[in-house]
């Protein structure tokens, strides 16, 4: 009988997929030498649902409700990328008012995502109080979403050529009130957290990623900007109408977990600046380009037959994707969210490839946790900010 050789005094531990610090169904096979991490192997795929294949069997309008299940904490960005691709393929113009509304919703969603990163991240490293504080502000954002879209999460608000509905009466004033209130809350977070000696002991110098490593691994978002690279797609690509607003790219040069925290705190402040400028300058006009809609009406049903009475009287809009290929991207809270889209003179995409920022950023985790302590795994993984619905798709 052959007895497999084993490394003496090493212990293999499974973290997840049920561990509360895994932020979803992530499993880590960790090899330990006492408290020191020798090796770490992430096991993905527990939340795989075949989102790319589903896209090839749905029209864009039919697929919109699915995309909100990728990153379910920042659903506006997955909706934006889903409509931006067909808009660019078909040269569809978005009304100015719709573009401003999109920017407001995207930045509110960015703040909500960063808040729900901050609370669990602080809980992972032992600070419970901020976990409860962030829900106070997050609920106000969800109230704004509910008033504008009808849903607190999974909004299904973006449409090809605009948005589903205009902003309701009084919504802009409510959003102004939230912006003024939220600035005071961010200052409270900074006083409570940033100079806390216990917090600094847990995050300073932990999970350092150098400038060259960031580029080699293809990292994006706060992971990239915390390592000294000022790269933000809102400035680089100027999609929607971000070039009309005055704001700064937030970045740090240390590349550790503290730097990633500071970048996200700064981004929330900048998002408020963008929202306030958009609210002040939002133009009138239509909220959707209805001219580009086409309807399949090959045969009108009789007024008294089964299809007319029970299946539905209203035909759904269809958009034919030209025979072209396109890569389109947006700056999501976690990094560069992109899709590679191939059209084929059909309402269905021939190929729909998703580039999730969380999946790319997660690849560097084994390198970061080696030679660190077991407790540092939670700090490093939390600072990366992943959502498994987006990672596994």
Curated annotation (Swiss-Prot):
It is found in: Plastid, Chloroplast thylakoid membrane. The gene is ndhH. It is a peripheral membrane protein. Gene3D superfamilies: Cytochrome-c3 Hydrogenase, chain B. NDH shuttles electrons from NAD(P)H:plastoquinone, via FMN and iron-sulfur (Fe-S) centers, to quinones in the photosynthetic chain and possibly in a chloroplast respiratory chain. The immediate electron acceptor for the enzyme in this species is believed to be plastoquinone. Couples the redox reaction to proton translocation, and thus conserves the redox energy in a proton gradient. GO terms for biological process: photosynthesis, light reaction. SUPFAM superfamilies: HydB/Nqo4-like (SSF56762). This is NAD(P)H-quinone oxidoreductase subunit H, chloroplastic. It comes from the Eukaryota. NDH is composed of at least 16 different subunits, 5 of which are encoded in the nucleus. Belongs to the complex I 49 kDa subunit family. Its main location: plastid. Keywords: Chloroplast, Membrane, NAD, NADP, Plastid, Plastoquinone, Quinone, Thylakoid, Translocase, Transport. It comes from Trifolium subterraneum.
């Amino acid at each position: 009988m052959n007895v497999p050789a084993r490394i003496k005094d090493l212990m293999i531990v499974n973290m997840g997929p049920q561990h509360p610090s895994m932020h979803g169904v992530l499993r880590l096979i960790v090899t330990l030498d006492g408290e020191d991490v020798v090796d770490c192997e992430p096991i993905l795929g527990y939340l795989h649902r075949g989102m790319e294949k589903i896209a090839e069997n749905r029209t864009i309008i039919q697929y919109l409700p699915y995309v909100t299940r990728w990153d379910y904490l920042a659903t506006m960005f997955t909706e934006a990328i889903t409509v931006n691709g067909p808009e660019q393929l078909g040269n569809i113009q978005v009304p100015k008012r719709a573009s401003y509304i999109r920017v407001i919703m995207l930045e509110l969603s960015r703040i909500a995502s960063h808040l729900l990163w901050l609370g669990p991240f602080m809980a992972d490293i032992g600070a419970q109080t901020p976990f409860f504080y962030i829900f106070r502000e997050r609920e106000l954002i969800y109230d704004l979403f509910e008033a504008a879209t009808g849903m607190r999460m999974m909004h299904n608000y973006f449409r090809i050529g605009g948005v589903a509905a205009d902003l309701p009466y009084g919504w802009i004033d409510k959003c102004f009130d939230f912006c003024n209130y939220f600035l005071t809350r961010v200052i409270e977070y900074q006083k409570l957290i940033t100079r806390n000696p216990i917090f600094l002991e847990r995050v300073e110098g932990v999970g350092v990623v150098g400038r060259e490593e960031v580029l080699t691994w293809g990292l994006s978002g706060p992971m990239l900007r915390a390592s000294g690279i000022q790269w933000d797609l809102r400035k680089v690509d100027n999609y929607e109408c971000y070039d009309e607003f005055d704001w700064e790219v937030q970045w740090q040069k240390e590349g550790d977990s503290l730097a990633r925290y500071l970048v996200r705190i700064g981004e929330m402040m900048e998002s408020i600046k963008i929202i306030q400028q958009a609210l002040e300058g939002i133009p009138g006009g239509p909220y959707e380009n209805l001219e580009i809609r086409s309807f399949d009406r090959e045969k009108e049903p009789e007024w008294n037959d089964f299809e007319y009475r029970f299946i539905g009287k209203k035909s759904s809009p269809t958009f034919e994707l030209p025979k072209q290929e396109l890569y389109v991207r947006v700056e999501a809270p976690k990094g560069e969210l992109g899709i590679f889209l191939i059209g084929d003179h059909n309402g269905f995409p021939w190929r729909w490839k998703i580039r999730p920022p969380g999946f790319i950023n997660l690849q560097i985790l084994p390198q970061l946790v080696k030679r660190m302590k077991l407790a540092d795994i939670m700090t490093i993984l939390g600072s990366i900010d992943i959502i498994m619905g987006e990672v596994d798709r």
